């Protein structure tokens, strides 16, 4: 076998992750069906089913992030820009996660102008929103605000909760190369760090007139908890 017939280990690993991600998707859909049946019968282990659903989604998000990072390293990070209704996209992301969040008594509120449209890669942005909403299941107390607005030529999508807030080392502004607490985050350790790194990568891939998208994390907001901000030019 010559070198041209030899697959790199990273390619084999990426292919395996892709197959595993698809299997997780099938498991998630099956569990979703079981949850619906359990709900109709007043199943006493319904909350356990929701917890399993949360973990499956978390694993699936990690595989999606790793595959995206692999494609980025191969200089093949896919971007497909089109104009979308921001309100419809946010509502779609909430609907997908609402059963999981409401099972824990989390109240979700959406604030977005109906006439707000923007150009972005819907699949990638929905991946960020889905991941952040899924994380809220674990970190918020019982409130979550999802909002969007125009600000200084950017689309700003913001998620706020009434949880304990981000630890100091997790506060960041991805426009800064150094000198911020966020610069000390080890993105490759822990699912939360990987999720943030993926979000930064997706944001930066959206460019317009020499400007890049960026991510900010802070504490405060209307609930005095954590605030995640996605800025797209």
Model-predicted regions and their roles:
Residues 54-62:
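Short alpha-helical segment of the dimerization/phosphotransfer core of two-component systems
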Residues 74-79, 117-120:
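Conserved micro-motifs of the catalytic ATP-binding
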Residues 82-94:
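A conserved beta-strand-to-alpha-helix junction within the catalytic ATP-binding
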Residues 82-83, 107-116:
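Conserved catalytic submotifs in the C-terminal HATPase_c
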Residues 143-153:
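Short beta-strand/loop element within the Bergerat-fold HATPase_c
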Residues 161:
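Acidic ATP/Mg2+-coordinating residue in the GHKL
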Residues 166-182:
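Short conserved segment of the HATPase_c
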Residues 204-221:
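Glycine-rich ATP-binding loops of the HATPase_c
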